Amino acid sequence: MSEELQPVFSIERLYVKDLSLEVPHAPQIFLEQGDPEVDMRVSTGSQKLEDGYYDVDVTVTVTAKLDNERTMFLNEVTQSGIFRLENIPEEDVQLLLGVACPNILFPYAREAVSGTVTRAGFPPVLLAPINFEAIYQQQQEAEAAGA
């Protein structure tokens, strides 16, 4: 009697791959008044490391500008994780890498952005949650339309 292999999905390691903050107009920018316009961009990526192990990245770039021209700060964080995925069908692996893993990583990236910006002397930046499932579906639809 053969044993059925059980699916495995686990977090092996969470880490910050890259973290940068630029305040190009310091210290003058701290004396200026106004409500900044904050722009956030998010991207994800993954790569296979070895059998069953994947490195997944969520990169968050936040730019704050005064009067839509003077940059207050530019903060970029790449939060990464090594995930173990075994005995999982390939279509489910892609879904886990594109949705589940980014959902796990994003709160860590959000905290890194907020903490870095606060330590730089600015008010905290509170980033709204991201619907990675909707992003994944859009990517799948775009790939299907291009095929």
From Swiss-Prot:
Q: What is its main location?
A: cytoplasm
Molecular-function GO terms, alphabetical: unfolded protein binding
**Where does this one sit in the cell?**
Cytoplasm
Which InterPro entries does the UniProt entry name for this protein?
SecB (IPR003708), SecB-like_sf (IPR035958)
GO cellular component term of the entry, any? cytoplasm
Q: Which UniProt keywords apply?
A: Chaperone, Cytoplasm, Protein transport, Translocation, Transport
Entry-linked Pfam families: SecB
One GO BP annotation here?
Answer: protein folding
| Protein family (similarity comment) | Belongs to the SecB family.
**Stored PANTHER family:** PROTEIN-EXPORT PROTEIN SECB (PTHR36918:SF1), PTHR36918
The function of this protein is: One of the proteins required for the normal export of preproteins out of the cell cytoplasm. It is a molecular chaperone that binds to a subset of precursor proteins, maintaining them in a translocation-competent state. It also specifically binds to its receptor SecA.
Question: What interactions and quaternary structure are annotated?
Answer: Homotetramer, a dimer of dimers. One homotetramer interacts with 1 SecA dimer.
Protein name per UniProt: Protein-export protein SecB
Q: What is the protein's species of origin?
A: Neisseria gonorrhoeae (strain ATCC 700825 / FA 1090)
